[in-house]
Swiss-Prot record:
Protein name per Swiss-Prot or TrEMBL: Glutathione S-transferase alpha-2
UniProt xrefs under InterPro entries: Glutathione-S-Trfase_C-like, Glutathione-S-Trfase_C_sf, Glutathione_S-Trfase_N, GST_alpha, GST_C, GST_superfamily, Thioredoxin-like_sf
Domain of life: Eukaryota
Record EC number: 2.5.1.18
Residue ranges constituting the GST C-terminal domain according to the UniProt record: 85-208
Described purpose of this protein according to its UniProt entry: Catalyzes the conjugation of glutathione to a large variety of electrophilic compounds.
Self-association and partners: Homodimer or heterodimer of GSTA1 and GSTA2.
Regions annotated as coiled coil: none
GO cellular component: cytosol; mitochondrion
Family affiliation: Belongs to the GST superfamily. Alpha family.
Location of this chain's protein in the cell: Cytoplasm
């Protein structure tokens, strides 16, 4: 397929949001075909468009790519956001996995059972403050550059910014003790493509509300 990438997901962040972020940071316009009903999802499956009967799925360069990490790897490689050599890619992958682990922990809180929410929220705060943010503060200090890896923008900078914005929504006080991360957030947010994506009216999705959660439950049956 030629033209803009087409993203298939429902109208929420979920596991597609990091893909939206990376495309936007690369300056790539994309279209979205939103899944709004169980029938929409079933049609994608019956038409053979979902390799593992799961979304996210992205149509790009004649392919129908599934699996979030595979999609991110392809976009990062295509738009030169994956470092200059194997060593940089190894660091990018390592940092990205940690970022995605914490991101998943935070975004899953909105759909966890009420009787588990307090414990899982406490765990997420502890992991944020005592494991993940200290690790990335240390990376920025030791690397001494504007970016996490090398001396230019890579996918991991975008993933980290997205995470920091989630942390800020979750509990802004968690960022208080991390001056380098706060400076990083401001710096990456000021990049033209990123700044544009942060503006109202972009394809960036807001935090899920109760209505969206209920709609997602109906579509994905969780």
């Amino acid at each position: 397929m030629s033209g803009k990438p087409v993203l298939h997901y429902f109208n929420a962040r979920g596991r597609m949001e990091c893909i939206r972020w990376l495309l936007a940071a690369a300056g790539v316009e994309f279209e979205e075909k939103l899944i709004q009903s169980p029938e929409d999802l079933e049609k994608l499956k019956k038409d053979g468009n979902l390799m593992f009967d799961q979304v996210p799925m992205v149509e790009i360069d004649g392919m129908k790519l599934a699996q979030t990490r595979a999609i991110l790897n392809y976009i990062a490689t295509k738009y030169d956001l994956y470092g200059k050599d194997m060593k940089e890619r190894a660091l990018i992958d390592m940092y990205s996995e940690g970022i995605l682990d914490l991101t998943e922990m935070i975004i899953q809180l909105v759909i966890c059972p009420p009787d588990q929410r307090e414990a899982k929220t406490a765990l997420a705060k502890d992991r944020t403050k005592n494991r993940y943010l200290p690790a990335f503060e240390k990376v920025l200090k030791s690397h001494g550059q504007d970016y996490l890896v090398g001396n230019r923008l890579t996918r991991v900078d975008i993933h980290l910014l997205e995470l920091l914005l989630y942390v800020e929504e979750f509990d802004a006080s968690l960022l208080t003790s991390f001056p380098l991360l706060k400076a990083f957030k401001s710096r990456i947010s000021s990049l033209p493509n990123v700044k544009k994506f942060l503006q109202p009216g972009s394809q960036r999705k807001p935090a899920m509300d109760a209505k969206q959660i209920e709609e997602a439950r109906k579509v994905f049956k969780f």
